[in-house]
């Protein structure tokens, strides 16, 4: 069976009376080069343990199994259990887990399932839960790389630079935890059903430590969210509106302490500037 052949896919799904779920963001690949190239991009080899999320009918899973020491594939849709039992019957190094990956203890999963293998994530992510999944992967503290296919617009946000339209809170969060790299685009016609948007494969190399030091990481991201929740406001106004216990006087003092113009907007600040601002604001609030 060819898991990227449209006729084979339709026959497979018909055998199991499977219907696509829009709410789960299900789009299955029909271009053989895509899962092969994603699996290659993950760097998986015999010494690698791969966590995959949302295997669909298993076309990427199959490619990962050919390269990795072990693949743990987590699928939310129980209706795919008999489908995957058929398509992955010959993949002895694949373990299927049915459930919501966001409820799993990822460090425990890695420790129990992968042993001494190098843990990575490789997946075609459901677009409707991209941000929560990336957050879970990057904060788990147990993965070397995260190679995923996501909506192109989101991928551009991950790699954006200060002062650009794509730069936002997600950018700062991801770049704080990882070094993102855009790899290649996948057009809509490579899927069934075809999505309305182009997809992009991106690789995140997870940092061993943050790129700059900060006194209070929780406060840092409170500051970041406040800055981007009020993009059209000056940073001083955004901070006073979005950071608990911060009035305009404290916000202005922190901005001045960082050598920033009083009229500056948050969307222009770099990671280092956000960290410095957070530290200054922490000192002001202290």
Where are these regions (language model features)?
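Short helix-coil junctions and helix-kink-helix linkers
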Residues: 240-245
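Short helix/strand-capping connector loops at secondary-structure junctions
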Residues: 253-262
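Catalytic cores of RNA-modifying enzymes
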Residues: 1-226, 256, 267, 276-286
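Short amphipathic alpha-helix in the helical subdomain of ABC transporter nucleotide-binding domains
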Residues: 248-251
């Amino acid at each position: 069976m060819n898991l990227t052949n449209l006729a084979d896919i339709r026959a497979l799904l018909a055998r199991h009376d499977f219907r696509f779920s829009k709410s789960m963001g299900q789009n299955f690949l029909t271009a053989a080069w895509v899962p092969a190239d994603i699996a290659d991009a993950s760097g998986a080899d015999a010494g690698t343990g791969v966590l995959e999320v949302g295997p669909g009918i298993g076309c990427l899973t199959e490619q990962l199994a050919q390269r990795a020491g072990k693949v743990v594939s987590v699928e939310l849709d129980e209706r795919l259990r008999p489908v995957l039992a058929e398509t992955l019957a010959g993949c002895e190094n694949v373990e299927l887990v049915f459930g919501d990956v966001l409820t799993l203890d990822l460090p425990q999963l890695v420790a129990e399932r992968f042993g001494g293998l190098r843990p990575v994530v490789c997946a075609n992510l459901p677009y409707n839960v991209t941000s929560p999944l990336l957050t879970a992967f990057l904060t788990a503290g147990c993965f070397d790389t995260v190679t995923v296919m996501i909506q192109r617009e989101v991928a551009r946000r991950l790699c954006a630079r200060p002062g650009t339209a794509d730069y936002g809170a997600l950018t700062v969060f991801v770049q704080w935890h990882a070094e993102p790299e855009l790899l290649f685009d996948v057009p809509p016609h490579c899927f069934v059903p075809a999505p309305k948007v182009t997809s992009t494969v991106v690789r995140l190399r997870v940092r061993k430590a943050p790129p700059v030091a900060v006194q209070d990481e929780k406060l840092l991201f409170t500051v970041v969210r406040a800055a981007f929740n009020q993009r059209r406001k000056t940073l001083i106004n955004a901070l006073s509106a979005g950071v608990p216990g911060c009035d305009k006087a404290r916000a202005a003092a922190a901005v001045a302490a960082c050598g920033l113009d009083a009229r500056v907007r948050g969307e222009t600040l770099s990671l280092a500037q956000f960290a410095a601002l957070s530290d200054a604001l922490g000192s002001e609030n202290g």
